[in-house]
């Protein structure tokens, strides 16, 4: 086909215009011009062409020829050069008449082969592929094939490809399964313009150009075809065309005197040298014209001659591949394919030079956002070449590609290493790109380091928002699963940005464990191709042998660098969309354009090391020069400042699923942070060397994201101080990360695995985290950290804005902070907002790190609590005493119970989730936003809860150490919070099984279940609780828009609502609300839970154990979801407690609940009394656990909002609310006013979580629960029950709380459906009238359009409307839902909710005067036996069924029967 297509070109080979095919009608005049063709062939070609032309045209041509004959040679040459090339109008009309021309087919064929590649785990919507092809044709002026013809060619190119219909009901699309866009686009071969060769060479130059145009693969394919044909004709096998040619010559089938024959015979023995360039040229022309001729010409000799010439040409190409100096030039592309580097050197340098130019062709892909410049990803690190695997990940760093292209051809295409490779970078070889990796600035020492995991899948997701087509690219070191990038995501500790980072071999251990800088710069957008081209990361580790291997977590510092690029990308995206205003301030407008060129330097200072920390600090300096053109980090970070996230209307307006711009970017950034955190923890586990890493990051800000994302969109300079202490116990004061750049915010994630304090001062992020080298958490260290952090926040007002994070009170940090403020001249509030978002990201990152099993010793980013300085700044102060005491107790309990699980309990937090991974709690705060996406995918059910991390500041108002609480919750919630973002925005398609799965429906053609979700829901769901295929109602609810109510395909759904009205079922449904929330993030965790349940069927399994195993299960299933795991652990604990509380429900159900609130809630759906209890407990737990309440509060202000709902609703309507949240939207106000304050109180009481929670819950619950009590009777009741149960096993309940929060959060997402909201209102103030509640929720929804509400939240209205929140409870919930509906529904919602929480009066949420615990307990007991409560539960069930939860009831019924 190639030859036929090239028929026109042969006519003008001498014209040196091989690229554009000349009009065929010019061919008649040209035969004489084709000296390469023998007379017979030329005449045959002429005759063939003449026959295809009508008589009138022939006569015209004859007339023209007569005129031309009068011209002089010079005039003829001029005429020839003036002949138009390309398709003439007449030809186009002819083509339209025809179904398709060979040229069109070849264009389509080449486009498909150059643009798409097989990838078993991805699918591409057919329409998108065709649309891209059409735009490609439009850009080049080709006539596109019809969709049907294109589909046929697709089948020819990918014979193994199958069509699938993916998507939710009513939104499904037909997809090509097993395909993905290429991560690297091969440079199109341009004609060779080097004529400085011998006569032979000159002749060969043109052919070489033509050969280049003929893809090497095409040539090899043609050779195979020729050999096959020859074997049939000559009945003799030929392995190569050369063999065939020699056979033809020897057998005298063709003349032996021709130059080609002599060349073949001479070259055959010599191997390569025999072939001459001229011969190559002749065959080229001949083959082009001859193949058709073979059919046309009757004489076998002609056919054989053509065949021979073609063979000769092929032979030449092959020889060129082999080191043939003369031919290597002509066939350099081929040589590149084989051993491009070696051959190229042999070949003429001149030829090579053109190829580097060709690399720039990357621009050609521009029509196709998928940047396929394999060069960049591959080239990033020499290791990368060996790591060909990394390339397969499809790091789509369009920006990077562009950047590298701009920087130097070498970076993009391996030009220096293998110029030939550029063109020859055939699909088979592109992944290798080993040598060029070096060319790219980044060198990754550890192959694993470079994870462009998300890119392939992400790309698919990205489509929704083209702004960040690179979203997928976001490198989530942590098994993102794209986040965009998420896919992704190899948990491999090292996540290298597409740019890749060079890390010292010394640092390798660190790098291996995710210390690798994960640069998202490539991921943010393809559009930012112009951004800085390359990321140079130099890691100069100063290693102290003193360090204990166990405490080698320090390397995570390296990971910080990647964050910056990510942030930058996000920023750029924001700039494109519009200036993003911090939600809080809304004042700060950063011009994205300026950011683009800026290089942010993130300097990590190890200055502030605690004396103890200095024990063995391994300091490695990482200079991360990141040209992060687009940092997707931008908006999502802002979730804490919900407004800022969606501030950018463009970003916000994106489809809710794919809030790519802000959400995705943010998502991506968090993934970066997360990976960093994870890497840190991984490094810790791997025993990497401790030490603070200094990073000099130059990050061109694609655009500064104002507001929460970077929170500090200050100057491009960011200094990150991270110090780790050998003594993990001591907080790393010195490990304060000061990030002045919003982009650097990502760096905030504590790099030091042992201890990290990340402080965000102004835009500076101070990450203070203490992580144990051992898996166990050291309460003392935490206390110290908390104190240090507190001091810092106290000392610096600016920091106070960031006070959410406990910032070590180091003068250096303060100075940094101040300096940052001064430098930036940014309002502290803005910074505070940014910090908040950053903190969230950091938190999430930590959680993510936690979620990775490897990071039991997550550095605690306790400091990362973003003091949502906006409105909740006052809440941010840590209660050191409470935090320390409770942390110690809780940590002990949690460690014991969840030591195996990486439940990232925040040490400072009330220890609610304190588990072996005490670090996590802090991390969720800062990582929250960034990690959000990560987390979401990691842990669907945990998602909502995590979101609150940023918000925690407001929530914890009553407690001096609200941050810990929020962080604690973040531990469990951060995941959920992030998850939503991550899932929706970042990994919509397949980023994470969980996160993705929920969000996938919205933004992606992929199935609801994301890759994270291990097996099908059927496999995952608890055998007892028959969950719908979605397996997590919460999952569906979370992405209500995207996912319809879980379909009950998996099991019969004959149950009637009446049955579900059983009292226990009613209670369970109240729990279901929770569960649904959990369900939101439950899918993955739910599956894990289910599996766990399968493993632990006994109904009375020890709650701690049960949830622990489940937790682990989570970790196993979602390495990146590990943070979720803790949440799930908490939730599981609560559920277990519920079980203990006296529901003798089959273990599987309990396990469901226990495993994960979400899971449990799902189970609850299958209405098992135990599950209901669990749900109730979960709801209650959230409140009881003081930490969790904070987290909840955080959710309101931030993406955590849903979680806030969980808390508030949980508190007031723990059971009903959870259901309601999903089915009925309980007004945020109601939730906040009643249960929430109690929850907060609980959180405040860190000392003895159980006692404190009980006491606080009691007093608060008295007011709120009783007042709300009737409203949220179910939830109150549940909350009390949960509280009591949780209090009994404090470790368990803390675990449960986060889950509940998550559940709540999920239900919030569910909010989108008004009916759901209404149901939630079943908790509606004492009146449990579903109808009224529905009206309220509907009104709230009406008031807040999802998208508009998201935008409002992003704009900062939510934060500002703190008091409004109370009045707007329902609307806020709706907002949350609406946020969720926008691209990052969950994240957005959380962010909106969090903002609301932030703005909320702390007293509303958590009345310091009230003690929730006691009241809760009493109320729970009362509710348990309260007919009104039961009625409410039943009503909520009914409303749920009415609102489309009939499937749940159906599910529940069989489950109920089974349970009965």
Swiss-Prot record:
Recorded family membership: Belongs to the RFX family.
UniProt-listed InterPro entries: DNA-bd_RFX, RFX-like, WH-like_DNA-bd_sf, WH_DNA-bd_sf
Linked pathology: Intellectual developmental disorder, autosomal dominant 71, with behavioral abnormalities: An autosomal dominant neurodevelopmental disorder characterized by global developmental delay, hypotonia, speech delay, and impaired intellectual development. Most patients manifest neurobehavioral features including autism spectrum disorder and attention-deficit/hyperactivity disorder. Other frequent features include hypersensitivity to sensory stimuli and sleep problems.
Subunit structure as annotated in this protein's UniProt entry: Interacts (via PxLPxI/L motif) with RFXANK (via ankyrin repeats). Interacts (via PxLPxI/L motif) with ANKRA2 (via ankyrin repeats).
Residues with PTM N6-acetyllysine: 704
Tissue: Widely expressed in many different tissue types including thymus and placenta, with high expression in brain. Expressed in both inhibitory and excitatory neurons in cortex.
DNA-binding region per UniProt: 108-183
Known role: Transcription factor. Acts as a transcriptional activator by binding to promoter regions of target genes, such as PDCD4, PIK3IP1, MXD4, PNRC1, and RFX5. Plays a role in natural killer (NK) cell maintenance and immunity. May play a role in the process of ciliogenesis in the neural tube and neural tube closure.
UniProt keyword list: Acetylation, Autism spectrum disorder, Disease variant, DNA-binding, Intellectual disability, Nucleus, Phosphoprotein, Transcription, Transcription regulation
Phosphothreonine sites (modified residues): 564, 988
Main subcellular localisation: nucleus
Protein name: DNA-binding protein RFX7
UniProt free text on domains: The PxLPxI/L motif mediates interaction with ankyrin repeats of ANKRA2 and RFXANK.
GO annotation, biological process: positive regulation of transcription by RNA polymerase II; regulation of transcription by RNA polymerase II
GO molecular function list: DNA-binding transcription factor activity, RNA polymerase II-specific; RNA polymerase II cis-regulatory region sequence-specific DNA binding; RNA polymerase II core promoter sequence-specific DNA binding; sequence-specific double-stranded DNA binding
Residues with PTM Phosphoserine: 322, 379, 418, 455, 662, 1178, 1329
Residue ranges, compositional bias (Pro residues): 947-963
Region: Disordered, residue numbers: 1-34, 308-352, 404-428, 481-585, 632-715, 917-1015
Keyword Zinc-finger included in the entry's annotation: no
GO cellular component: chromatin; nucleus
């Amino acid at each position: 086909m190639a030859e036929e297509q090239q028929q026109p070109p042969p006519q003008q080979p001498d014209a040196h215009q091989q690229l554009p095919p000349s009009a065929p009608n010019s061919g008649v005049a040209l035969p004489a011009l084709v000296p390469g063709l023998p007379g017979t062939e030329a005449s045959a070609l002429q005759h063939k062409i003449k026959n295809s032309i009508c008589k009138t045209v022939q006569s015209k041509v004859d007339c023209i020829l007569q005129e031309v004959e009068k011209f002089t040679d010079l005039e003829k040459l001029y005429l020839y050069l003036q002949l138009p090339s390309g398709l003439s109008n007449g030809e186009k009309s002819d083509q339209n008449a025809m179904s398709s021309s060979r040229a069109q087919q070849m264009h389509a064929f080449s486009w498909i082969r150059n643009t798409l590649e097989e990838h078993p785990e991805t699918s591409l919507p057919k329409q998108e592929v065709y649309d891209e092809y059409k735009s490609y044709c439009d850009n080049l002026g080709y006539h596109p094939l019809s969709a049907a013809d294109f589909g046929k060619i697709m089948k020819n190119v990918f014979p193994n490809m199958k069509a699938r219909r993916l998507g939710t009901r009513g939104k499904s699309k037909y997809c090509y399964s097993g395909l993905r866009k290429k991560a690297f686009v091969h440079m199109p071969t341009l004609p060779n313009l080097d004529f400085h060769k011998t006569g032979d060479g000159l002749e060969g130059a043109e052919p070489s150009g033509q050969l280049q145009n003929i893809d090497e693969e095409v040539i090899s394919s043609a050779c195979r075809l020729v050999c096959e044909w020859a074997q049939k004709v000559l009945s003799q096998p030929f392995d190569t065309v050369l063999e065939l040619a020699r056979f033809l010559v020897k057998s005298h089938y063709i003349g032996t005197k021709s130059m080609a024959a002599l060349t073949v015979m001479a070259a055959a023995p010599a191997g390569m040298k025999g072939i001459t360039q001229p011969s190559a040229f002749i065959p080229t022309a001949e083959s082009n014209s001859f193949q058709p001729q073979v059919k046309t010409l009757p004489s076998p000799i002609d056919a054989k001659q053509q065949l021979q010439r073609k063979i000769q040409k092929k032979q030449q190409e092959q020889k060129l591949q082999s080191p043939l100096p003369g031919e290597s030039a002509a066939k350099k592309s081929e040589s590149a394919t084989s051993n491009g580097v070696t051959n190229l050197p042999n070949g003429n340098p001149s030829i090579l030079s053109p190829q580097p130019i060709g690399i720039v062709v990357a621009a050609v892909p521009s029509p196709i956002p998928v940047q396929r410049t394999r060069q960049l990803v591959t080239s990033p690190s020499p290791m990368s070449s060996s790591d060909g695997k990394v390339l397969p990940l499809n790091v789509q760093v369009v920006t990077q590609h562009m950047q590298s292209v701009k920087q130097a051809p070498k970076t993009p295409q391996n030009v220096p290493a293998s110029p030939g490779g550029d063109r020859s970078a055939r699909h088979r070889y592109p992944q290798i790109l080993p040598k060029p990796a070096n060319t790219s600035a980044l060198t990754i020492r550890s192959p694993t380091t470079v994870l462009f995991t998300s890119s392939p899948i992400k790309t698919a997701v990205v489509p929704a928002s083209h702004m960040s087509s690179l979203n997928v690219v976001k490198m989530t070191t942590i098994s993102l699963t794209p986040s965009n990038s998420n896919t992704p995501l190899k948990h491999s500790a090292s996540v290298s940005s597409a740019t890749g980072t060079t890390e010292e071999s010394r640092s390798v251990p660190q790098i291996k464990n995710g210390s690798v800088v994960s640069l998202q710069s490539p991921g943010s957008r393809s559009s930012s191709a112009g951004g800085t081209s390359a990321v140079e990361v130099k890691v100069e580790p100063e290693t102290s042998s003193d360090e204990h291997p166990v405490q080698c977590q320090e390397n995570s510092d390296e990971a910080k660098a990647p964050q910056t690029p990510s942030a930058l990308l996000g920023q750029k995206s924001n700039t494109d969309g519009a200036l993003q205003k911090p939600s809080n301030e809304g004042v700060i407008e950063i011009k994205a354009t300026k950011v683009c060129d800026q290089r942010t330097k993130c300097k990590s200072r190890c200055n502030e090391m605690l004396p103890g920390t200095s024990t063995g600090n391994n300091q490695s300096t990482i200079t991360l020069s990141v040209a992060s053109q687009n940092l997707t980090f931008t908006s999502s970070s802002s979730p804490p400042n919900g407004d800022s996230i969606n501030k950018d209307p463009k970003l916000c307006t994106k489809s809710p699923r794919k809030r790519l711009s802000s959400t995705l970017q943010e998502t991506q950034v968090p993934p970066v942070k997360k990976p960093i955190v994870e890497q840190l923890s991984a490094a810790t586990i791997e025993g990497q060397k401790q030490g603070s890493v200094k990073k000099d990051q130059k990050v061109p800000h694609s655009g500064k994201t104002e507001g929460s994302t970077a929170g500090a969109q200050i100057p491009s300079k960011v200094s990150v101080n991270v110090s780790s202490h050998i003594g993990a116990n001591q907080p790393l004061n010195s490990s304060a990360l000061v990030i002045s750049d919003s982009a650097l915010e990502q760096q905030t994630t504590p790099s030091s695995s042992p201890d990290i304090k990340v402080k965000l001062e102004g835009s500076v992020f101070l990450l203070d985290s203490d992580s144990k080298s051992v898996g166990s958490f050291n309460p003392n260290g935490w206390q110290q950290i908390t104190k240090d952090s507190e001091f810092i926040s106290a000392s610096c007002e600016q920091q106070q804005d960031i006070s959410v994070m406990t910032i070590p009170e180091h003068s250096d940090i303060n100075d940094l902070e101040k300096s940052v403020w001064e430098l930036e001249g940014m309002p502290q509030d803005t910074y505070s907002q940014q910090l908040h978002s950053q903190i969230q990201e950091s938190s999430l990152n930590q959680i993510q790190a936690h979620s990775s099993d490897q990071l039991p010793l997550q550095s605690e980013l306790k400091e990362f609590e973003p003091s949502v300085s906006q409105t909740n700044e006052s809440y941010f102060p840590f209660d050191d005493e409470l935090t320390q005491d409770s942390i110690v107790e809780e940590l002990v309990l949690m460690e014991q119970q969840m030591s195996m699980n990486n439940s990232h309990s925040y040490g400072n937090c009330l220890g609610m989730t304190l588990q072996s991974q005490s670090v996590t709690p802090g991390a969720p705060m800062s990582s929250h936003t960034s990690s959000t996406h990560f987390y979401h995918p990691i842990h669907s059910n945990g998602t909502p809860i995590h979101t609150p991390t940023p918000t925690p500041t407001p929530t914890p108002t009553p407690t001096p150490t609200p941050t810990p609480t929020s962080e604690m919750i973040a531990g469990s919630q951060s995941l959920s919070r992030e998850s939503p973002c991550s899932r929706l925005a970042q990994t919509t398609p397949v980023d994470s099984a969980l996160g993705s799965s929920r969000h996938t429906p919205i933004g992606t053609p992929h199935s609801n279940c994301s890759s994270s979700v291990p097996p099908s829901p059927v496999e995952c769901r608890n055998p007892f609780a028959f969950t719908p295929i979605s397996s997590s109602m919460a999952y569906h609810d979370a992405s209500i828009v995207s996912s319809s109510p879980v379909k009950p395909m998996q099991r019969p759904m004959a149950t009637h609502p009446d049955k579900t009205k059983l009292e226990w079922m009613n209670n369970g449904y109240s729990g279901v609300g929770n569960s649904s929330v959990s369900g939101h993030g439950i899918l993955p965790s739910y599956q894990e839970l289910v599996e766990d349940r399968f493993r632990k069927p006994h109904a009375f399994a020890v709650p701690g154990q049960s949830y622990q195993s489940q937790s682990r299960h989570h970790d196993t299933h979602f390495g990146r979801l590990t943070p979720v795991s803790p949440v799930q652990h908490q939730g599981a604990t609560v559920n277990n407690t519920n079980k203990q509380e006296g529901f003798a429900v089959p273990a599987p159900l309990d396990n469901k609940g226990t495993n994960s609130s979400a899971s449990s809630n799902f189970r609850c759906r299958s209405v098992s009394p135990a599950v209901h209890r669990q749900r109730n407990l979960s709801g209650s737990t959230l409140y009881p656990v003081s930490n969790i309440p904070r987290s909840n509060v955080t959710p309101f202000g931030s993406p955590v909002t849903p979680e806030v709902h969980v808390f508030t609703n949980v508190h007031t309507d723990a059971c009903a609310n959870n259901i309601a949240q999903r089915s009925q939207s309980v007004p945020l106000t109601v939730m906040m006013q009643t249960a929430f304050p109690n929850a907060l109180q609980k959180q405040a009481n860190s000392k003895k979580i159980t006692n404190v929670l009980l006491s606080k819950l009691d007093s608060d619950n008295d007011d709120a629960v009783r007042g709300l009590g009737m409203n949220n009777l179910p939830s109150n009741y549940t909350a009390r029950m949960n509280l009591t149960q949780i209090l009994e096993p404090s470790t368990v309940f803390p675990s449960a709380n986060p889950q509940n929060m998550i559940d709540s959060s999920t239900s919030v997402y569910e909010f989108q459906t008004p009916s759901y909201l209404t149901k939630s209102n079943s908790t509606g103030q004492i009146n449990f009238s579903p109808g009224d509640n529905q009206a309220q929720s509907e009104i709230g929804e009406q008031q807040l359009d999802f998208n508009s509400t998201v935008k409002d939240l992003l704009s900062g209205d939510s934060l500002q409307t703190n008091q409004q929140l109370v009045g707007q409870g329902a609307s806020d919930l709706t907002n949350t839902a609406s946020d969720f509906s926008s691209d990052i529904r969950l994240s957005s919602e959380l962010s909106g909710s969090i903002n609301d929480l932030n703005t909320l009066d702390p007293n509303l949420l958590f009345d310091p005067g009230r003690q929730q615990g006691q009241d809760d307990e009493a109320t729970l007991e009362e509710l348990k036996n309260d007919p009104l409560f039961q009625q409410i539960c039943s009503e909520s069930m009914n409303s749920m069924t009415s609102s489309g939860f009939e499937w749940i009831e159906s599910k529940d019924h069989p489950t109920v029967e089974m349970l009965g």
